[in-house]
């Protein structure tokens, strides 16, 4: 059975969870990854109730060691990977703490870099032609008032994804 890894999974009605369910319905064992174990367990249980396979992985996408460990836990056979992480919270630039802006960038873009690096290494090691997808937002294409941190982080992630596509 092929394996898929989806990172950035929150509530059952969110995009990450719905991607997991759709992928599982296409004969993948899905590794459901995110920050909140309770949310992950709900998604995993829903997938299992549908007669499919899934496991949860709690992860901090900005921690390189966590990301490396996550790909080890998935093991061989990874064929499909999705980075669906983002923190879309409004805030005016002049009112925004630097720590908030940095967290937004680290979560959306830096975490995407760490994830892609480990997934690509896995694909190359196994000599597979796996698929790596980054979910985006219209925020990656244009700035929007009160969303400067999210806009800039998603724009950077889009550029990273384009660079990766040209390299591999």
What do the PLM-derived regions correspond to, one by one?
Residues 28-42:
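Conserved glycine-rich Rossmann-like NAD(P)H-binding loop of the short-chain dehydrogenase/reductase
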Residues 75-76, 107-126, 166:
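Amphipathic alpha-helical dimer-interface segment in Rossmann-like NAD(P)H-dependent oxidoreductases
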Residues 87, 94-113, 133, 157:
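Catalytic Tyr-X3-Lys loop
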Residues 7, 78-86, 108, 134:
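Rossmann-fold scaffold of SDR-type NAD(P)-dependent oxidoreductases
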Residues 1-30:
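Canonical Rossmann dinucleotide-binding motif of NAD(H)/NADP(H)-dependent dehydrogenases/reductases
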Residues 8-10, 131-156, 161-162, 166:
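Catalytic loop of short-chain dehydrogenase/reductase
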Residues 47-64:
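Rossmann-fold cofactor-recognition segment
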Residues 2, 77-78, 123-136:
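Active-site loop of short-chain dehydrogenase/reductase
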């Amino acid at each position: 059975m092929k394996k898929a890894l989806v990172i950035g999974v929150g509530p059952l009605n969110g995009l990450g969870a719905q991607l997991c369910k759709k992928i599982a319905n296409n004969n993948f064992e899905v590794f459901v990854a995110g920050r909140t174990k309770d949310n992950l367990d709900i998604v995993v249980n829903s997938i299992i109730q549908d007669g499919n396979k899934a496991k949860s992985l709690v992860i901090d996408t900005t921690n390189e060691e966590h990301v490396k460990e996550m790909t080890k836990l998935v093991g061989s056979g990874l064929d499909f990977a999705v980075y669906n992480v983002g923190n879309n919270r409004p805030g005016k630039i002049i009112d925004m703490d630097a720590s908030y802006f940095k967290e937004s960038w680290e979560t959306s873009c830096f975490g995407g870099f760490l994830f892609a690096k480990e997934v690509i290494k896995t694909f190359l090691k196994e000599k597979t032609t796996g698929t790596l997808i980054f979910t985006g937002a219209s925020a990656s294409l244009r700035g929007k008032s009160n969303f400067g941190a999210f806009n800039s982080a998603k724009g950077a992630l889009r550029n990273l994804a384009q660079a990766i596509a040209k390299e591999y």
